[in-house]
Structures are given as structure tokens and as C-alpha cells.
Amino acid sequence: MAALGDIQESPSVPSPVSLSSPGTPGTQHHEPQLHLHGHQHGSPGSSPKVLSQPSDLDLQDVEEVEIGRDTFWPDSEPKPEQAPRSPGSQAPDEGAGGALRSLLRSLPRRARCSAGFGPESSAERPAGQPPGAVPCAQPRGAWRVTLVQQAAAGPEGAPERAAELGVNFGRSRQGSARGAKPHRCEACGKSFKYNSLLLKHQRIHTGEKPYACHECGKRFRGWSGFIQHHRIHTGEKPYECGQCGRAFSHSSHFTQHLRIHNGEKPYKCGECGQAFSQSSNLVRHQRLHTGEKPYACSQCGKAFIWSSVLIEHQRIHTGEKPYECSDCGKAFRGRSHFFRHLRTHTGEKPFACGACGKAFGQSSQLIQHQRVHYRE
């Protein structure tokens, strides 16, 4: 693998960063280095891999990477897998940040450090250990990648990205408590675990949207939102279901889809106990209990619980009937009425009585039939 210093600067790189390791004595010439603790796929006696020279790396929204952690990306949104390429090749738009991401993904997730640091005496080496296999004194997971703002002016877009990357986001495990949120917004008091998340949140108050789509001009506060939007233009769908093969452009949509297969319904109503697979469905359901009707018709003032019902209602005023039967040509305002009509042609009767087994094409017919059993 080529050293990061050998990678040419990408035109899209907005802000130079440097790599450093905490707790390391000052190196000669103050060159920032990242020691990988021998976690490369090599022999125990191989020399430790050191990345040197502060190349201009574009790590996008990366705040911190700790060697040995289960998750390399602290951001809540997972990064899509890159298509495999031949060794030594590099995409034209992939800067040194892409090389670093590939490097980190190649490391074992829970490997323990056993890098050797030059010759040592037999007295310093534990019994039974071969030369070059003396364990590193630094605890596993304590090394980090630190983003440091550089004074030198970068290419176009650098001031925008520098605001997001221009802070030391790295931290060692010993340096902060698990679950701590030390970065607080002065405007609303909300706290965040990482300073980059605070910077992104503050754009809600300032209205700043530094990431602009070159296709349609739409702007975004965060880099991840911009990347997800860009897939609308490219058609990229990196998240594929292993059970049915359906692909999605957003990880959140993929997660919601998986609940169809596993039957998971994590969102439960506190009033009636009904559970839902999506939080939005729970919010809409709770309006049945609260009586809230946030969607009002601008023509007649009638209000509705759901926006879909409002859209269907507005077709009364416009006369629009978008659902047309291909068999008889009859058109309908709503989809539910359209599907109910189709059953008159297909003969489908999906509503069956639990008492006698008689089936009906419409739910209203089933309800009317069940009154016979109630009288009995």
C-alpha cells in the first residue's frame, strides 16, 4: 500500500489535515505520524507501519478514528461500501482521504497490538516471545486520527469545509467518559458528543448551508445529507436487501424495509399498545388519541389527521380522478376506492368472517354480515 504522502492532492480536497498520535513524545522535525501498531497483515516481527508527512486529506465528516474499535465511523450515518478496484488503482475523484478509509477498513477490528520497536534485550522481552514481538505499551484503541486546521489557504470550498474540520476532534478512550457530551450549543443548550456534530447543529440557528448540489442547486447543512441527495441524480443505491434484492439509496429506508422481513415493530403506542415498524406511523396513529388534525383544506377549512387524506379530499374541489380502471374506464379520486372497485372485476374477497368463514369483497360488507352473529 502506498504511503499517504505519495498520493497526489485532489482538486476537491477542501482543507489540509494532519495525522497524529496522543501521548507520543515530540518527533524529529515535528512531522505528524500515525503508528498502526503492527495491525497490518504482516508477520509479528515486521516493522511498524508509520504514516508520515501532513498530506492534504479529505476525511469528510470524520471526527475520530480509533484503531481497534468496532466502528470506525462515529457519525450515525453509515458510509456506503466502495466498489472493489484492482490493487494500486485509484479513482480520479478519490483523494488521500479515500486511501486512509481503505487503510482503516483493512485493519482487523479487534486486533491486539504486538508491534516491535527495534532491537531489545532478552531481559526486556517476556519469556517465550520471539524478537520483535514485544507488546506496545500504549493500550489498544488509544490511538486516534486528529484533524487539525492548517493556516495555508486551500482550494475552492476550503473555508466552508475548514469550519467543519478545523477542530481537534480526536480523543483517546482515557480522555473522555463513555456517553459524555461535552460540546454544548450556546443558542439552545443542546449537547453533542463530537464538536463536528455541534458545528453541524449550529447551522440550524445560522441558516448556513455550505454544501450545494451542482445538478439542481439545492443546498445542505451537512455533508452526509448532500451525499444522500446526490444519489437522486446518480441513481446509486448502495444498500441492498439480502432477502429480496431490493436496493435503497438511504440507509434509513433500508433499515425500515428490513422490518418487513423480520416483523420488528419497535415503536409502541403508550395509549393502546399498538406497535409500528416506523416512527412516522406511530406519530400519525397517536393523533387518533389526541384528536390533532394538523392538515387543513385551504378551500373549505376542513381538517384531517393525515396529509394523504387531505390530498384525496382536495380532489373534490379540483375534480381530479387519477386512478382509472383499465377494464371499464371508471375513474376514482382515492386509491382505496380504486382497489375496492377492481375486486368487482377480479372476484377477490379478502375479508373473511371469523365465525362462519364467509368472505366478502369489501370490509363494510363483512361488518354488516357480522351483525348476524352478534344477534345470535
Curated annotation (Swiss-Prot):
Domain of life: Eukaryota
Low complexity bias locations: 10-27
Zn finger spans (C2H2-type): 183-205, 211-233, 239-261, 267-289, 295-317, 323-345, 351-373
PROSITE patterns (UniProt xref): ZINC_FINGER_C2H2_1 (PS00028), ZINC_FINGER_C2H2_2 (PS50157)
UniProt feature, compositional bias: Polar residues: 43-55
Pfam families assigned: zf-C2H2
UniProt-annotated stretches for the region Disordered: 1-97, 113-135
Main localisation: nucleus
GO cellular component: nucleus
Cell compartments where the protein resides: Nucleus
GO biological process entries: regulation of DNA-templated transcription
Chain positions with Phosphoserine modification: S86
UniProt entry keywords in alphabetical sequence: DNA-binding, Metal-binding, Nucleus, Phosphoprotein, Repeat, Zinc, Zinc-finger
Molecular function via GO: DNA-binding transcription factor activity, RNA polymerase II-specific; RNA polymerase II cis-regulatory region sequence-specific DNA binding; zinc ion binding
Entry similarity comment: Belongs to the krueppel C2H2-type zinc-finger protein family.
Protein name: Zinc finger protein GLI4
